[in-house]
Amino acid sequence: MNKAEQSSHTPMMQQYLRIKAQHTDKLLFYRMGDFYELFYEDAEKAAKLLDITLTQRGSSAGEPIKMAGVPFHAADQYLARLVRLGESIAICEQTGDPATSKGPVERQVIRILTPGTLTDAGLLEERSNSIVLALALHRGSIGLAWLNLAAGDMRVLETSSDNLTSELERLHPAEILLPESLDLPATLNNFAGPKRLPDWQFDYEHAMQQLTRQFGTRDLNAFGCEDLHAAIMAAGALFEYVRLTQQTATDGSSGQLPGHLHTLQVERQDAYLRMDAATRRNLEITLTLRGEDAPTLSSLLDTCSTGMGSRLLRHWLHHPLRNRITLQQRLDTVSDLIGAQPETLYAGIRQQFKHIADIERITSRIALRTARPRDLSGLRDSLMRLPGIIELIATSAAAAVHRFIPPMQPDPLLTQLLVRALQPVPGAVIREGGVIADGFDAELDELRGLQGNCDEFLLQLEARERERTGIPNLKVEYNRVHGFYIEVTRAQGEKIPPDYRRRQTLKNAERYIIPELQAFEHKTLSAREQALAREKMLYERLLEQLADFIIPLQEIARSVAELDVLCAFAERAALSGYTKPVFTDDPVLIIEAGRHPVVENQVEHYIANDVQLGAITRENRQMLVITGPNMGGKSTYMRQTALTVLLAHCGSFVPAQIARIGPIDQIFTRIGAADDLAGGRSTFMVEMTEAAGILRNATAQSLVLVDEIGRGTSTFDGLALAFAIARHLLTQNQSYTLFATHYFELTRLAEEFPQAVNIHVTAVEHKRRIVFLHRIEEGPASRSYGLHVAALAGVPDRVIRNAAKILARLEQETLSRSPQQTLFETVEENAKAVPASVHPVLDYLERIHPDELTPRGALEQLYLIKSMLNQTD
C-alpha cells in the first residue's frame, strides 16, 4: 500500500498498516487497551484458526474494518494454539503514555513468536523440544543447522540427499528455513511448512562473520566444522533469523543473539545408531503408527520427574549412541542406582527432582531477558534443594552416580543473590510489583514505606474530620477512578466545612477533597509509580547479574536431566526385570528370553523368546527366515529385537535375561506399508522404496527387519522379489537379518545358504480353532492358518467354507504340477499323526521336557497352558 492509499485511513489505522507492512508474513497482535486486536486478513485467519468472533466496526478509507480480538491477560493460550498450527506472530504493544500522546498512542513490535524459536513456558510443550532448522546446499552436500533456543543448544551436520528425510524425521523441526532459490526437496512435503529467506543470508562469508562474532573466535577450527561449507552457510542463515526474531528492546530494534548460545556442536552421522524414517515410525519410539503419544517406547520409559529429563529421554531414544565408553558409563550408573539402596537412592532422587524447576529453559529466558519473577523464584528454590540431593548421592555406595556431584553444585553467590533479591512468593509480573524483597534496596523500601503509611494516615484523618465536622459516619476512602475522597451522606450536607471541595455527586452522598488529602494523594500515588519504576529497574539489573551464571546453570540443567533419565531407566529395569546388556567386539547378536518392552506391559503374561544371530560357535547365523500364522507374533518378535538393541544403545537395561550385542551401525525395518497418497506412491511403491534403501545402505553391522516383502504385486512377482532381496541381503549386505514371510518357498534358502536359518512361531489347531503359542521354534512353519485368522476377524462362515474349498483345490493343483514340493504333504502327515480330537494342551504337554525347565521356565509353561485352555474352551 502506497502513502497516498495509507493517508486515506484514520490515524490509528495508518499506524497499524505501517507496522503491519514490516511483518507481512506474521499475524500482528495489536494492543488496544485490555485486548490484542487483529485486523483485515489477519482477523479472518485468526477467527478461523481460533474459533473466535469476526466482527466489523466502523470503517477506514471507506471500507469496513474486519477485526477479531483476544483478552491480553489470556493471550498465551491463543498464542500457543497459533504457533502449534505453524503461525508466526508479532506482538505490538503500547509503548507511549496515553496521557501525553497526541493522536494514536505510540506502539512498537516488541516480541516475535515463531514455531521454532519459542522460549515462553506458557507456549512450549513441557516434555518436548521446539527446534528451528536451516538447510543449505553446497556442491551436492546438504548442510543442516538447527537450534533449540529454549535450551541454548545449536548443532550442525552435513548429509546427502538420500539421508535428508531420515535426519528430518530424527530432528522433527517446528520450522524449516530455505534459500529462496533452492528447489524444494520433495522430502520436505511431510514436514513443517518451509520459510524462504533471501539467498544472501546463506552466503558463506556472511555466515563466517556471524559465527565468529557470536563465539568470539577468529575461525571455527575449535568447533571442528571449518570444512563443512554447507553447514556453515545454514548456520549463518539460522543466526540471522534468530537475531531478527528476538526483538526484546522497547524501541523495536532487532535483538542480539543471546549469551547462552556460546558453542556450536558438530554432529557426525557415525556417532549414532542410524535409523531411517520408516524405522522410527515402525518401532513406535515416540508416536504409534496411528500418530498417538501412547503406547510407545517413550511413554513407557518416561517417568522422569522433570521436563528436562523427559526432553533428554526423547533425544536419547532418537539418538542412540555408538560410543561404548559413554554407554558403559550410563549402564554402570543405572546398575548402581538399582543395586545401592534402591529405596533411598533412585526413589529418593526422583522424589527430590519433582521439586526442581525447568532450569534449562529458565536459563535461556535469563539470557534473553524474558525471565518472569516466578521463573527466578523457581530457580532459587531449586538451587536451595540441590545440596540435599548432592548429600543423598554422596552418602550412598553408588560410586558411578558420584560423577554428578561436581556439576550439580550450585554457586553459593548465585543462591544468596536470589534469596536476598526476591520475595518468598513474588508477583506474577514485574509491572504489578511485589517482586523485589524488602531490605534489598533502601530507596525501594523508603518508597514502599510511604505507601505502607497510607492506611494509618487515612484512619487518623477520618477520626479528625469526624470530630471537626461533627459528622459521625464520615468516611475517608479511595478508588482507582477518583482517587482519595471524603464521603458524606446528603442528610449531613449542612455540616460541610467551607474547605471541602466537591469531587463527585452520588444518589445519597457527596464526595469531597480537601487540600491536605489532595497533597497526600499526590505524594502516595507518586510514591507507588516511583516504587514500580524502581522495582522494574532493579529486576532488569538482577537479570544482568544472573547472566554471568549462565554456563554453570546450563551444566546443572544437563546433569539434573541426565540423572533424571537414568533414574527412570533404573525404575523401569527394577519394575520389569530388565538386565544389563553386554557389548562385545564379536559379530553377534544374542538375546535370551527377550520381550517386547511395550507389549509385555499391556498383557497379563508375555512369552519370551531367544534371538541368535552372528558367529554362534561354529555356526554363522546371518538370517532368520521366520514363518508362521498371522497374529502369531512374527512382527512383535522382530520389533522386540530392534527395541532391545535400541535401548542398549541408549544406555538402558533391556527386557531379556541375557543380551550380548556386537558392533551395530544401523537399524532398518520394512514392516507394513500404506499408500503415500500425498507423494503419489502406492503401497507396493512405498514397500519397494524402503527395500531399495535397505539394499543400498545396509552393511555387515546393520540389523535388518523385513516383514512380508512383495505382497503388493502378483504372487510370482512378489515371490521372485522376496527371494532376490533375501539372497542379496545374504550375499552382498551380509547384515543381521530377520526375514518374515508367508512365501513358504523362501524356507529353501536354508538349503542353499548355511547362514540362513528357518524358525517359526508356533500355533496348534483344535476343533477348527487356532491357539497362538507365540513361541519361536527352530524349523519352518507347517502352515499359515490364514483361514482361522479370517474367522477370528469375523469373516462369515459361508465365506470361510468357500475359501477352504478353493484352498484345497489350489493345493491339489500345485501338488499335481509340482510333485517335488512336499510342503502340504507334510501337513497331511502331521494331521494324521495328531488326530483332531486330541486337545492341544495334551499335544503340547507331550513336547515338554520337565527336567530341562528352570523354575521361571516352568512358571511360563503354566501360564501358557492356562492361556491355551482359555482359548479352546
Curated annotation (Swiss-Prot):
GO terms for molecular function: ATP binding; ATP-dependent DNA damage sensor activity; damaged DNA binding; mismatched DNA binding. Keywords: ATP-binding, DNA damage, DNA repair, DNA-binding, Nucleotide-binding. It holds the Pfam family MutS_IV. PROSITE patterns: DNA_MISMATCH_REPAIR_2. SUPFAM superfamilies: DNA repair protein MutS, domain I, DNA repair protein MutS, domain II, DNA repair protein MutS, domain III, P-loop containing nucleoside triphosphate hydrolases. InterPro entries: DNA_mismatch_repair_MutS (IPR005748), DNA_mismatch_repair_MutS-lik_N (IPR007695), DNA_mismatch_repair_MutS/MSH (IPR017261), DNA_mismatch_repair_MutS_C (IPR000432), DNA_mismatch_repair_MutS_clamp (IPR007861), DNA_mismatch_repair_MutS_core (IPR007696), DNA_mismatch_repair_MutS_N (IPR016151), DNA_mismatch_repair_MutS_sf (IPR036187). ATP binds at residues 628-635. It comes from the Bacteria. CDD domains: ABC_MutS1 (cd03284). One of its GO terms (biological process) is mismatch repair. GO terms for cellular component: cytosol. Belongs to the DNA mismatch repair MutS family. This protein is involved in the repair of mismatches in DNA. It is possible that it carries out the mismatch recognition step. This protein has a weak ATPase activity. This is DNA mismatch repair protein MutS. It comes from Nitrosomonas europaea (strain ATCC 19718 / CIP 103999 / KCTC 2705 / NBRC 14298).
